Amino acid sequence: MVEQRNASVAIVGAGDYIGSAIARRFAREGYQLHLARRDGTKLDGLVAEIAAAGGTASAHSVDARSEEAITAFLDAANAAAPLELVVFNIGANVNFPILETTERVFRKVWEMACYAGFLTGREAARHLLANKGGSIFFTGATASMRGGSGYAAFASAKFGLRAVAQAMARELGPQNIHVAHLVIDSAVDTAWVRERIEQRTGTPPPADRLMEPESIAEAYWQLHRQPRDAWTHELDLRPAGEPW
């Protein structure tokens, strides 16, 4: 039986892989999990799985681009038990040649990958300041560090999110809030990723070129447990075989 803490973890962008793995990892430590994605019914299986293992989780349908929706979600999470960690994990990874990048595409990707992160971070900070501390983690990507061909919309949004995280870390660190940006610098091991790589190369991906969601989640847990006198702000994660 998991010993329950009087503390909440909220994940905005609780997808099937990284977000779900983070939820499972923190549920094992007794945190109350509050999970948000556009269609919250897609989280029913994960919520049931966590409950069956003795944990506590709730699913929420949230449009992270809505200030009202994000505010209501984090208010509810903090009311259930004081927030200790908020994770922003929305990707919006799309590839469009620059001449095919419409205004709508560019704006929507920015809203999902940057603006929604700002809303999440601001509202998380509001609660964590009242709670006298905690952590806010932003999931980044290779595109957070460099703009690849066809990734003008995605990379510009991820660059922006990284800047939001840096500014928040400098402002909030002295107030006992650990703000971190995690760069996921490789493909995550999923059936879809394996299929795409094999279609492109004609061979299965090497075992040392993919990241397991559970391994990524472990890094989030270790980061959250860091002592205040040795906080990491930016952490880049990649498998041993990934060229960089």
Q: Can you name each region flagged by the protein language model?
A:
Residues 31-45:
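Conserved glycine-rich Rossmann-like NAD(P)H-binding loop of the short-chain dehydrogenase/reductase
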Residues 97-98, 105-110:
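Substrate-binding pocket helix/loop in short-chain dehydrogenase/reductase
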Residues 50-68:
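Rossmann-fold cofactor-recognition segment
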Residues 135-160, 165-166, 170-173, 188:
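Catalytic loop of short-chain dehydrogenase/reductase
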Residues 174-186, 200-244:
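C-terminal helical subdomain
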Residues 15-16:
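Conserved glycine-rich cofactor-binding loop
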Residues 6-7, 56, 82-84, 128-141, ...:
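Active-site loop of short-chain dehydrogenase/reductase
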